[in-house]
């Protein structure tokens, strides 16, 4: 093993991905090893490292590391509203997340740099009969940096178990917009697919670059233990969008003034925004009957955030998105 490969194996985020679910109470019943291939084996321990840096006329993807099944090829510059913005698409060579997968991602935006990170399509968490899948995401945004992390929805198949932990370390002058969309499952595929997963556990936390905690949000969904169709949870909706916007306080009031609460049970959409603790930013949540409605609400919030923070809007949406 080369020194570089050894360093990647021992990367803190990757080590955390392997340890994340071991002591999680919600996964205590799912510690058995898969019969096919042990958890975290070669090909099941993915890693991505993306470091963005500012150069004279644009930001660039200055450093990249990748280990299967995680893959990134190169940065493209397709955002006509921000021509200097490197856009990177994360790819999975396995096509979905499988039992025993341990995934880790490190994204570092250096001072004054910008970046947009997305996925090529929805992420599917495959059916499981043993163990679980885990994911660590670690974001660092330095002074004056700007990061958009806007992946496509995650679709948990029935009997799947998935735990994810995200940490955003950010300078007070920087901006990060982090999005996640969770579907109820493949509701048109099988009668037991809608909320048929065993566990979905998500933790998102933010801190300043000195390590001072700004906020923590964690939720554990176990639809076979307690129905998610209750009022105050999903209330018959099938898609959940969660957007964290960390940005200087001077932008908060202007953004909130343009994002009124919206509840339309007949139209199948509900959304709203509020402030995060410690004046660190805003949180926007949306519920819908399908991913299209939730993605449209998120896109509108994203558009407003861009306009108020950067003074530019979003480009026209690609037809295939």
UniProtKB/Swiss-Prot annotation:
It holds the Pfam family UreD. InterPro entries: UreD. It comes from the Bacteria. One of its GO terms (cellular component) is cytoplasm. One of its GO terms (molecular function) is nickel cation binding. The keyword Kinase does not apply. It is found in: Cytoplasm. Keywords: Chaperone, Cytoplasm, Nickel insertion. Required for maturation of urease via the functional incorporation of the urease nickel metallocenter. UreD, UreF and UreG form a complex that acts as a GTP-hydrolysis-dependent molecular chaperone, activating the urease apoprotein by helping to assemble the nickel containing metallocenter of UreC. The UreE protein probably delivers the nickel. Belongs to the UreD family. This is Urease accessory protein UreD. It comes from Yersinia pseudotuberculosis serotype O:1b (strain IP 31758).
């Amino acid at each position: 093993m080369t020194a570089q490969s050894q360093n990647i194996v021992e990367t803190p985020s990757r080590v955390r991905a392997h340890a994340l679910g071991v002591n999680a109470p919600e996964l205590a019943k799912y510690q058995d090893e898969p019969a096919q291939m042990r958890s975290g084996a070669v090909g099941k321990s993915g890693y991505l490292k993306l470091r963005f840096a500012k150069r004279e006329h644009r930001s660039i993807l200055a450093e990249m590391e990748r280990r299967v099944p995680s893959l990134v090829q190169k940065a493209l510059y397709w955002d006509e509203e921000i021509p200097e913005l490197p856009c990177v698409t994360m790819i999975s060579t396995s096509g979905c997340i499988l039992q025993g997968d341990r995934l880790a991602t490190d994204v570092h935006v250096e001072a004054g740099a910008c970046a947009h990170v997305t996925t090529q399509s929805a992420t599917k968490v495959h059916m499981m009969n043993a163990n679980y899948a885990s994911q660590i995401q670690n974001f660092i945004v330095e002074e004056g940096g700007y990061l958009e992390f806007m992946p496509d929805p995650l679709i948990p198949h029935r009997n799947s178990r998935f735990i994810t932990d995200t940490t955003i370390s950010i300078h007070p002058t920087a901006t990060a917009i982090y999005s996640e969309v969770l579907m109820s499952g493949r509701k048109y595929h099988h009668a037991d697919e809608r909320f048929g997963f065993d566990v979905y556990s998500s933790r998102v936390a933010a801190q300043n670059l000195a390590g001072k905690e700004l906020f923590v949000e964690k939720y554990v969904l176990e639809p076979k233990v307690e129905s998610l169709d209750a009022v105050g949870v999903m209330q018959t909706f099938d898609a959940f969008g969660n957007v964290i916007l960390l940005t200087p306080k001077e932008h908060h009031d202007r953004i909130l003034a343009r994002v009124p609460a919206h509840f339309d049970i007949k139209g199948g959409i509900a959304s709203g925004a509020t402030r995060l603790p410690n004046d660190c930013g805003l949180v926007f949540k949306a519920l819908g009957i399908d991913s299209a409605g939730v993605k449209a609400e998120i896109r509108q919030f994203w558009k407003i955030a861009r306009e108020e923070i950067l003074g530019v809007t979003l480009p026209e949406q690609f037809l295939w998105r």
